[in-house]
């Protein structure tokens, strides 16, 4: 599913009117109908609930006023509009909606009467829509904080008021929505870092316009990864295949300081369905694993001061060819020293396989980007690692990750995942794929090592690196959904993610057949 900016929505509505004779007022009526249907289906006994509708001076407020009329017309009378209109220039469509509503529903001034909101069960937020690009007034900041502290169910129209729909930036303060009912397509800002704590479940309303028409008009190359998109990626495993044909993965990493990371990656690769996983680690720490993880094939490497020695480079490249390795992951637990730097840099220059580069290996890539441009490689940095690669602050990365990621892949023609809430995958053609999951459960030690193994595992099984990144990001995130369903909202570990992986993958396969 495409994600869109406010400008793209503006162009969409203009073309719908110009080319299909669909006027904006009809779209507003359809939006109100969509909102009404959601409220009626989601909340039992809706006619007996007190509903507050917050309306601003723009078309978002027009949607809210139209909703009030729909509710009233369907016998739901416990409605009050709290308006933010005094002294404001109101939109033409809002004027029409106010005229249609007449005096059927009580309208109060939110600046004067906001404390009365504590008496309402449901709050529909239509103050600001996708056009907000400035910081909100101090009075509204205070009111938004008051509303957020009430603990009421908040349903936002298009986007929670106070969020920049293009960047996800909080414009001073924003409402924390339990549900966001967004029109046509989801907005980019809903899935940006700044908005994570303000955006609940996102539900898309098509407003009676076929998705084929919308996609034909909207040129966005930012995509939300959903079940429909995954249908074109995931494959059903062949029943007759043997282990040698199920994919061979090599994990390179480990050091005397970090013994756990590479084993997490190796086990994750196995759990994706890879037939054979080889683990190349310093000889001394390979002895730690052997008795505990018999499924893994160990390749002991010469070490120097507890780190992988540069002398192993030729041996590793030989193993890749001799054993028919199809995908490699380098970095988990590998540590930082001069030998490791030389090993990582020369390995990436010489290797000709699909490669996942993660963790400390990312510390050495900045100086060789030109040498490896165009290779079948994916970097998987978190914000801190990305900041070192592109020499930008972590704060800048978090606020401008789409722009920074696009600039990076356009210049170096590499694959890139910027990890974090709603992780982003960038392919070399500058398409962006947004992971729908932003759960804090995934922020746990070793979670990134698991993702590395997942991507390498899928890559070895015949998936392109792009497909492996999209699918891997999704099942990694979906594991948190499964954990919440059966275990609760705390306590997910990297080892738990590995155990859950087959369930997450199986669900993707099951939905492919629906």
Swiss-Prot record:
Where along the chain is (6S)-NADPHX 1 bound?
Answer: 158
Q: Which GO terms describe its biological process?
A: metabolite repair; nicotinamide nucleotide metabolic process
Q: What superkingdom does the record give?
A: Bacteria
Domain (YjeF N-terminal): give its ranges. 9-215
Q: Where does ADP bind?
A: 419-423, 439-448
Region NADPHX 1: start and end of each range?
59-63, 129-135
> Would I find Transferase among this entry's keywords?
no
Q: Where is this region: NADPHX 2?
A: 382-388
Q: What is its EC number?
A: 4.2.1.136, 5.1.99.6
Q: Where is region (NAD(P)H-hydrate epimerase) located? A: 1-218
Question: Where do the annotations place (6S)-NADPHX 2 binding?
Answer: 333, 449
Cofactor annotation = K(+)
GO MF, one example:
metal ion binding
Catalytic reactions of this protein: (6S)-NADHX + ADP = AMP + phosphate + NADH + H(+); (6S)-NADPHX + ADP = AMP + phosphate + NADPH + H(+); (6R)-NADHX = (6S)-NADHX; (6R)-NADPHX = (6S)-NADPHX
PROSITE patterns xref list: YJEF_C_2, YJEF_C_3, YJEF_N
- List every stretch annotated ADP-dependent (S)-NAD(P)H-hydrate dehydratase: 226-514
HAMAP family the UniProt entry points to: NADHX_dehydratase, NADHX_epimerase
Q: Which family does it belong to?
A: In the N-terminal section; belongs to the NnrE/AIBP family. In the C-terminal section; belongs to the NnrD/CARKD family.
Per the entry, what this protein does is: Bifunctional enzyme that catalyzes the epimerization of the S- and R-forms of NAD(P)HX and the dehydration of the S-form of NAD(P)HX at the expense of ADP, which is converted to AMP. This allows the repair of both epimers of NAD(P)HX, a damaged form of NAD(P)H that is a result of enzymatic or heat-dependent hydration.
Name of protein: Bifunctional NAD(P)H-hydrate repair enzyme Nnr
